Each structure stands twice: as structure tokens, then as C-alpha cells.
Swiss-Prot record:
Pfam families: TatA_B_E. This is Sec-independent protein translocase protein TatA. Belongs to the TatA/E family. It comes from Paraburkholderia phymatum (strain DSM 17167 / CIP 108236 / LMG 21445 / STM815) (Burkholderia phymatum). Keywords: Cell inner membrane, Cell membrane, Membrane, Protein transport, Translocation, Transmembrane, Transmembrane helix, Transport. One of its GO terms (cellular component) is TAT protein transport complex. It is a single-pass membrane protein. It is found in: Cell inner membrane. Part of the twin-arginine translocation (Tat) system that transports large folded proteins containing a characteristic twin-arginine motif in their signal peptide across membranes. TatA could form the protein-conducting channel of the Tat system.
């Protein structure tokens, strides 16, 4: 009564195929495969070597400015 044998799994698979149909199961399989592929690509894009990150940060153009008080507009009546 412990684990299920191969015959139990084959019967379950046959019942699932009869209930859902092979076309529906094929669509579910392809959708699941596409989702896993997209997840793996997303994980690969998120991982960048640390050396590349430093290079990207050092290449940014920085503009040094000093903040001054804002001059009132001539139209302001405050």
C-alpha cells in the first residue's frame, strides 16, 4: 500500500487523457514549456558579472551643477 507502481501511473495518465483530450494536454505542455523558457531567459538577463556592472556605472555622464535659489517670476504678485 506504500508507493504507486508504474501501472497505477499509466491508469491515471489514461484517465487524464480521456478527460482532457490529447490536444488540450499538448497545448498545456507547450504553454508550460514556453513559461519555463521565458523564466530561464529572465533569470539569465538579471545576472550580470560584477565587472560589467562597474564598467556601466563608471561610463555614465555626470553633470556637476550648483543649486541656487529660484528667482521669483515677474508675474508673481506674492
Amino acid at each position: 500500500m506504500g508507493s504507486l507502481s508504474i501501472w497505477h501511473w499509466l491508469i491515471v495518465l489514461l484517465i487524464v487523457a480521456l478527460v482532457f483530450g490529447t490536444k488540450k494536454l499538448r497545448n498545456i505542455g507547450s504553454d508550460l514549456g514556453g513559461a519555463v523558457k521565458g523564466f530561464k531567459e529572465g533569470m539569465k538577463d538579471g545576472e550580470t558579472p560584477e565587472g560589467q556592472q562597474r564598467d556601466q556605472l563608471s561610463r555614465t555622464n555626470t553633470v556637476d551643477v550648483d543649486a541656487k535659489e529660484k528667482a521669483p517670476h515677474s508675474g508673481d504678485s506674492r
